[in-house]
Amino acid sequence: MTYQHIYNIIKKKAYFDAHQAVLIAVSGGVDSMNLLHFLHAFQAKLQIRIGIAHVNHKQRPESDDEEAYLRSWAKKHAIPIYVAYFQGAFSENAARHLRYQFFEEIMQQEHYSALVTAHHADDQAETILMRLIRGSRLRHLAGIREVQPFANGQLIRPFLTVSKAELPNPFHFEDHSNDSMAYFRNRVRHHYLPDFKRENPQATQSLIDLSAESRLLLQAFDDLTKGLEFHRLNCFLAQSAAVQFFLLQHYLETFPQLAIKKSQFDDLLHIIRRQKQGIYPIKNTYCLLIEKESFAIKKIIPKTDLNREFKMVSYGDSLNYRGYRFVFSGSLTDKGHDIAIPLYSLSPVTLRHRQAGDRLFLGEFSKKLRRLFIDGKFTSEQRQNAIVGEQAGVIIFVLVGDETYLRKASKHDIMLAKLYIDKLEKR
C-alpha cells in the first residue's frame, strides 16, 4: 500500500481536521519511520506542522546512533526535534511512563495539540490476545483506540486500521530486543499469534473484530445509561445485578491511577450493595465513601485526620499500626505471635478506629461495639484506642484493651490465611 492510499483512508476519518501542530513519537523503528515519512510527505495536504519526539532509552549500543540519525534528519528537513533520556533501573513500565510523561510535557510547552503514534492493526491484534491471556475485563478487550484524549489535546493512531504488511519499508533501525522471548509481546508476536493463524488464517482480523464489537457494546451500554444518577444508592440498587456490575466498572474507569484486582472490584460492589455508611480504603490513598443516600470514590488528601483513620494490609504484606505489627500471611502456624486471626478471604484487611453503628457478628446474633465495650467494662481510653479489623466492609475482629473479639465464622468457611498481631514493644 502506498502513502497515497493511506492518505485517502486517513483523510476520510478527519483525524487532523481540528489540529495544526502535531507531535510524532519516533523510535527509529520501521513503524514510526513510516509514520514520520508519511506525515512529512502529506503535512501540507493535511494542513499541519509536525515535530519529532524521541526517547533514547540508553539500553542498546545503537541507541545513540538512532538519536544522531533522527537529529540529522530533522535538521535536514527543518523539523523541530525533542529528545529525552531514560535514567535509573529499566523496565518496560518505567520506560513507557517516561515516554508519555515526556510527550505530555512537550505538547504543553511547545503547544502541540495532538500526539501521533505508529500503532497498526497487528499491534491491535497482539494487544487483544495479550489481554485475553492475562484475563482482562471485557472493557479492556475494546483494545487500542484510534483517537483518545491526551494531555492538552488528543492521542491519534492513524495506522490502526492498516496492517504492518501494507506499510512500505523505509530506512529504519532494527531493535533486536524485539526478538527476545523475555518480553510477553514478543512471545505473542512470534509464537502465540502465529499458532492461532495456523488454526485460523483470519485470526488477526478476528481479534480486531472482537475489539471493535466490544467497543460497540460498551458504547451502547454508556448510551443507554447516560444521565443515570447511579451515585444515588436508591438508583444504583434499583438496577439489575448485571447493570450494577458495569456501572461500577464504568465509574472506576474515571480513575486511571486506581487499577484494582477483580477480587477488590467484587468487594467494592458487595460493600455498595450492603449500603453500610462508612469510609472504605481501596488503594493509593483512594477510598469508597458511602453516605446515607449516595456513594463516591474519593482521593484522600495526605496529612489529614481522615487519612490517619485507617490502614490497609494486603495478603503477603505487613505494617505497623497504633502500637502493633500486623502480618497477613498464608502460613497457618501461630508460634511466636501474640494474636492470630483466622481469615476466610484473601481480600485486604482494613484497620481503623471504631465508628458509630459498628456491629460484630457473634453467631446467632450481632452486637454493637458500644454494647460490647460496656459489657466488657472497658475504660473510655481503651474504647478510644480500640482497633477494628474488617474485610469487604464486614468487621472480622475487634482489639480492645487486652481482649480480642472475633467474628463468628460460618461452618462452611474455609480458612485461607491468618492475620498475626504482635505488640511492637515486644520487638
UniProtKB/Swiss-Prot annotation:
GO terms for cellular component: cytoplasm. The keyword Iron-sulfur does not apply. It catalyses: cytidine(34) in tRNA(Ile2) + L-lysine + ATP = lysidine(34) in tRNA(Ile2) + AMP + diphosphate + H(+). Disulfide bonds: none annotated. Belongs to the tRNA(Ile)-lysidine synthase family. The N-terminal region contains the highly conserved SGGXDS motif, predicted to be a P-loop motif involved in ATP binding. This is tRNA(Ile)-lysidine synthase. It comes from Streptococcus equi subsp. equi (strain 4047).
